[in-house]
């Protein structure tokens, strides 16, 4: 048996700590979604990165096992790829900043529909999603439109972003000054290098407009959106497409910052 540490949705003031220990028959990768017993019910949880816990098998001695008194993981949602380490680090930062438990933040930023599903239900959703994608066929790869020539300011900004280490940069300008074109060029660079691109929208009403502009600029690229106006099923489908690497472009409001992107 192996010990794993699981983040569950418990308040920071509950006294339970950031993670709870459970036992599993097989080692579980960090970021794996599970269901674990908590009190009288099974709740969703996430196996949390902990190098020492992952390396420590429970003693085979029955007396030692009894001393640990760990409950077993109820179910492993093995159909879903584990959440990436970068996502876990982002959640840990948010938990520290807002003084919340890791599980409280981690579970709250997952799609509500995902938290309700067991592994069989999740696998079924993913099969249906794959069938719909196969039935629709590949997106017609039309030639992308010719981008407008860059202004001197845009050229300077892009050159600075390409040469600098990853950091926060502020683009300031009135409407129509060319900020969106900079975002489009940065997204193009990410897509060309085989990465996914996440574009955050300041308010939900701007999502359709920006989505149409990105779709026109990148024909043949799969684009999904994430915001609170989507139905629970739509939000889960788009989240899965992003997490599984199927969606290349993700547009969304601030909730999309917690969307895991493998590339």
Predicted regions and their residues:
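Accessory, non-ATPase domains that flank or precede helicase/AAA+ motor cores in DNA-metabolism machines
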Residues: 1-263
């Amino acid at each position: 048996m192996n010990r794993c540490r699981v983040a569950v949705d418990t308040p920071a003031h509950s006294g339970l700590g950031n993670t709870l220990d459970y036992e599993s028959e097989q080692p579980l990768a960090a970021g794996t979604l599970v269901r674990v017993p908590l009190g009288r019910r099974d709740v969703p949880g996430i196996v949390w990165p902990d190098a020492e816990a992952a390396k420590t098998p429970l003693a085979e001695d029955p007396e030692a096992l009894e001393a640990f008194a760990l409950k077993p993981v109820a179910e492993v949602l093995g159909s879903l790829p584990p959440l990436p380490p970068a996502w876990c680090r982002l959640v840990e930062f948010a938990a520290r900043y807002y003084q919340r438990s890791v599980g409280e933040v981690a579970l709250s930023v997952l799609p509500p529909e995902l938290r309700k599903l067991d592994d069989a239900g999740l696998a079924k959703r993913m099969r249906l999603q794959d069938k719909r994608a196969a039935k629709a066929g590949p997106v017609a790869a039309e030639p992308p439109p010719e981008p407008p020539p860059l202004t001197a300011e845009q050229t300077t900004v892009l050159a600075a972003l390409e040469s600098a280490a990853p950091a926060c940069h502020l683009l300031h300008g009135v409407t129509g000054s060319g900020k969106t074109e900079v975002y489009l060029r940065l997204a193009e660079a990410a897509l060309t290098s085989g990465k996914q691109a996440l574009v955050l929208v300041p308010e939900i009403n701007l999502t359709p407009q920006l989505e149409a502009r990105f779709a026109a600029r990148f024909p043949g690229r799969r684009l999904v959106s994430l915001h609170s106006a989507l139905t629970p099923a739509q939000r889960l489908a788009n989240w899965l497409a992003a997490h599984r690497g199927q969606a290349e472009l993700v547009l969304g409001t601030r909730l999309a910052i917690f969307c895991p992107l493998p590339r």
